[in-house]
Structures are given as C-alpha cells and as structure tokens.
Amino acid sequence: MAREYKIEDYRNFGIMAHIDAGKTTMTERILFYTGKNHKIGETHDGASTMDWMEQEQERGITITSAATTTFWKGPDGRKRRFNIIDTPGHVDFTIEVERSLRVLDGAIALLDANAGVEPQTETVWRQAEKYRVPRMVFVNKMDKIGADFYRSVEMVGSRLGAKALVLQLPIGAENDFEGVVDLVYMRALRWDGSIGAPATVSEIPSDLKEKAEEYREKLIEMAVEVDEVATESYLEGVMPTDEQLVALIRKGTIEVQFHPVLCGTAFKNKGVQPLLDAVISYLPSPVDVPAISGIDVKTEDEVTRESSDDAPLSMLAFKIMNDPFVGSLTFCRIYSGKVQKGISLENTVKKKRERLGRMLQMHSNSREDIEEAFAGDIVALAGLKETTTGDTLCDPLRPVVLERMEFPEPVIEIAIEPKTKADQEKMGIALNRLAAEDPSFRVKSDEESGQTIIAGMGELHLDIIVDRMRREFKVEANIGQPQVAYRESITKAAEIDYTHKKQSGGAGQFARVKIIFEPHDGDDFIFESKIVGGAVPKEYIPGVQKGIESVMGSGPLAGFPMLGVKATLVDGGYHDVDSSVLAFEIAARAAFRDGAKKAGAQLLEPIMKVEVVTPEDYVGDVIGDLNSRRGQISGTEARSVSTVVNAMVPLANMFGYVNSLRSMSQGRAQYTMQFDHYEPVPSAVALEIQKKYA
C-alpha cells in the first residue's frame, strides 16, 4: 500500500483551551465540516464525538486526548490530511495536554471572547512554549454576551507575552455577530448560522473600512519583518502581494515569531471554514518543523530522525487507552520511516522487543484497521505488552531513544480500599492498568498501615480514576479523606562524621564517612564525592550514594520524601577486610538520619495558584474566605460583569472549596486551581502535622 497523501499535505495539530472555551464544540464542527460526522454532537446534551469516555460525557469536560484523522480541501482545491489530537482543558489533566503537545506540529489556542486569556490557557501556552509549538489563536464565542475581540487580543500580549498577528476583525458582536473582515484578502465573510453553510463574500462594511485599513497595515508591517528581502521592498514602498503575504505569515508562524489571530463562533457555525483554511496556510507539516532528535543506542551520540519514509523507523508512544473491544491501545506518532502490521519493534526505553499485532486509524471512537503507516501518521497499536507512555519504538537494527517526556509529581493522596473480598484482586489489576495509562497517577502501599494509597494532580483527577475503576473494571471501592502530599527539606548545612562498626565472629563490618549535607535550590538530590587519596576506595562510593538515596523517601519529621538536598562526601575510612559496599551503605544511611535533624529539617507544603471568577457582589466574601484559608491574595481584576481574584493558597486548606464557593456565591462563582510550588509550613501547623504522622 503506497502513501496516499504526501507528507507536506499532513497537518498534525491540537486544540488547546481553558475548560468551557468551546473546544469540544469546535472539534465537532471541524469533524462535521471535514465530512467525518453527519450529526453534530453538542456538549450540552452529552453526545459529543471526541468525548468518548462515559464520564466525560456526564461532566461535559474532555479528559483523554483522542486522535482523529480527517481531510480538508484547502483554498487551492488540494485535499490535506488532518490528524487532530483533542486535549483536555481542565487543570487536573495538564499531563494529558503535555503529552499531546509533545507529538503535535502545531496548535490552535481557543479563547472565550468574553473571558479572554484564562489561567488554564496560560498554563497550556507555557507548555506549548516549552516545545516551541507553532500556534494560532481563535477567539471563539463571539456571539456571547460581553464578547470583546479587541480585549482578548490585548490579553494575548499582556497575559501570554505573545505577539498577536490579527488576520480578521469581527463584524458585529454578541447577538449581532455576523461574520469577519478578512484582512489578508480585504473582504467581508458572512454566515447565516445554519450548519455547513458556506460564507457569502462581500465588500467590507463602510463603518469598518478605516479600521480594516489600519489593521492590515499593522499586519503587513509585522509579516515583512520575518524576511529581509520583504522588509527592504516594503521600506522602498513595494507592498507584498496577497500570495507573498500568506507565505510571510506562514514563515513567521512556523518560526514562532508571532501567532495569527482569527475569530468566530463554533456553536453558531461562523468562522470555522476560514480557520480550517488557516490550518493549511499557516500551520506546519511534519517536514516544516525541526527533525526530532534522540540518542543512538549503539554509539550514545545525539542523532536526528528526518520526517521521511526512507529514514529508519522511529515512533513515540504518547498515550495508552483501554478500549472495550480491542483491549489496550497504544497511540504513537511516527516520526520517521514506515511501519507494517506484524513486524517486530524495539522498545529502547524498556530494552524489550514488541510484536505489532493490529494497527488502527482512529476516528474519535470508531476505528479502521490499516496494514501500513508512514512518517507523520498518528496510529493506535493493539497488542503491545511492555510499552508505556513516553517510550520509543523503533527499527531493532537502528535503535534510538527519542527525548523522554517529563511528568509532574502528584500533590494529593487518598487511601482506597475494596468494598468486598471479590473486589480486592480486581482493584490491584485496575489500578495498575490505570497507572500505566496515566503517568501523573501513582499507586503505592503504605508500609505501616498496609493501605493502598492513590496519588494524583487534584481531587477531580482522583474522582475520575475511582469512577473509571467502577465503570471499566467493575470494582467498587471506599475512599478516605484526601491527604496533602507534604515534603521535607533542610535549612542549613551540617557536617556528620559517622562510623559503622560491627563485630560478630568472622568478618565484621566497618565503614567511616564524613558527609556535608546542605540545602540547594532545586527539588532533586545531588551527590558529590570530594574524596582524595583513597580515604574511601572508589568502589565503595556508589554505596554511600545508594545509602543516602534509600532514606531520602522518608524524612526525619513526619516520614515525607525529602527535596532539595545536596550531600558531599569529604572524608572517610575503611578496613581492608571488614569494609564492603553494604557497610558504607549502612554508614551513609545513619549519617543522613543524623544530618537531616542537625541541618534544620522543615516541612514543606504544596501551594496552589487559585483563580476565582465571581460576580462583584461576592468579591468581599471570596477574599475573606481565601484569607481564612491562609491564602495570599495576589491581585484582583475586573472583567465585563465579574471580578477575578488571584491568590496563592496551601492545598491543605482547599479541600471541599467547591462547595463553600457554591454556597457563598449562590452557585455563580467558578474557580480553577493548579500546583505552583512548595513552601515551608508555619511552625504551629507543622507541629500538628508531625503529631498526626508521628
């Protein structure tokens, strides 16, 4: 089977947005306009195509990124292949967003025309910035009360620190929103609002003529800056043609120099087709972005893999899903080469071979079996046993490890126990399966109480895990009160000289270590050896590091993992017969226990960035309540009919906040919360925590 579409005609992109910015509706419209869906599913009635998991449909939020392949004929009449990855907009699922951004070539950031740039938009934007993903902005919900296109554009600059390149102006707003002024071709596009209706093209309305001229001039000035020749011509008074302008906008977008901004309303079917045309005109194909780099397993050199069918096969597993019909599905982005059903793949991270059974092309939740796939494709593989998120699969003869994904540490823990004996065994299987799908979800066993503890990114995250366990694995469980994932650290340097000696007939044990423990700015553990003259033989030094690392998971105050510790081995002593790696491990462990106390151990707690959007009447109550939760108010900001309150609040004081806020504002205020940083716990609170966990 030969390649159906040239790789230059692929667009792998995602839609990123704050919860409720209309992302699912937009994806539905795109699938409808590109001919995949016959009946549009509205999120309001829980029938949306992309939201294929039951709970997503109930809660009206998108959780898992489902990959969908569809097609669109561009302005030039040529058909392109779109692989759309749906990303969740809720804060507890930033991990999903991170995974999808990792395998995208471009993205559309969706803004709510009334709210503009919201906190989750900022978070996702920063993640996209990290991977240098070219982005366009679509100001959605232009038909909504309080819709303000120009304020949204201003916020792209002020809140995201990004350069907005305005390509369209709205004609009317709120109920009177009719269409857009296209600044590239200087024309008006209007829609009657019926599903699938094409735009009618007309002259720019006279009251917008002057504004359109002004914005087109700004557009040209920004676009020519990306090319020296175009800049020179422009300064000499030569204007770029429409085709040249499109090429300049494409170049600047792909180089992430600016972000094209369009507008419309997906729900009312206005502005969707020009957005699809813009995906083709301005977002990159797999060959327009830098080739992915990785490490050659044989030589350990850095290598790149070009987006070409002739290059050695390399693909990245970015998502694992349980499918009721096929079992476990591993979603992969093919970066280079081609893959056929039935071949052997090397998993270079796990150092295991995988045999490829079925290969599927996914459309939301229908699927099509395929025999072969090529560079640039996004496919779902069935039957892989060892592969987890972030692993590289490649040609066994040309092994490579692509860049690893990094996942955040969970901030909240809950004890969970099966309701019946029958649920006991099934619960373990279910939790392990769910943890394989989601690297930000962890399962562990509490050694003292024997309880199973699940940890995640927030209350909603863990709610949904428990819910999925019930639905997909038929496991009923009781859950305890959420607990905060505290951490411990040290505040000053301490030098410990410790000798471990044991004589018990025959060979004894002997090891002496002198270690300086001190705090450092990062969260990780740093070990350094400054041993000179063989005071501790080289082969024993790894034992010292291993010994310290083995007790880093349990701090001296309340047994929480330690953060930000640096240990420097400066001196020591050994015995020719009695010393061993194990003896040095034991000595280092004891030295750390002493050192952590002497170095001023302290408890740390997760601090959450909280944003509350509330009607003005309740601002005083909201601020008073946040203060009572040990919150620090960092600012308030007025938005059309509501006020935004920003604060930093300890997670320990935010449990059950949703109910308090609801009753305080008669259900009219909303909030979002995400982990920001760790901070020392006030001493009075720290004592209570120590008593509780001692």
Swiss-Prot record:
- Organism of origin is Bartonella quintana (strain Toulouse)
Q: What does this protein do?
A: Catalyzes the GTP-dependent ribosomal translocation step during translation elongation. During this step, the ribosome changes from the pre-translocational (PRE) to the post-translocational (POST) state as the newly formed A-site-bound peptidyl-tRNA and P-site-bound deacylated tRNA move to the P and E sites, respectively. Catalyzes the coordinated movement of the two tRNA molecules, the mRNA and conformational changes in the ribosome.
Lineage per the UniProt record: Bacteria, Pseudomonadati, Pseudomonadota, Alphaproteobacteria, Hyphomicrobiales
Task: Family membership, please give it.
Answer: Belongs to the TRAFAC class translation factor GTPase superfamily. Classic translation factor GTPase family. EF-G/EF-2 subfamily.
Gene that codes for this? fusA
Name of protein: Elongation factor G
Name the HAMAP family for this protein: EF_G_EF_2_B
Give UniProt keywords alphabetically: Cytoplasm, Elongation factor, GTP-binding, Nucleotide-binding, Protein biosynthesis
Q: Which residues bind GTP?
A: 17-24, 86-90, 140-143
Specify the superkingdom: Bacteria
- Could you list the residue ranges that cross the membrane? none
Alphabetical list of SMART domains matching this protein: EFG_C, EFG_IV
Give the location in the cell: Cytoplasm
Q: Which residues form the tr-type G domain?
A: 8-287
GO annotation, cellular component aspect: cytoplasm
* Annotated GO biological process: ribosome disassembly
Gene3D superfamilies, per this entry? Answer: 3.30.230.10, 3.30.70.240, Elongation Factor G (Translational Gtpase), domain 3, P-loop containing nucleotide triphosphate hydrolases, Translation factors
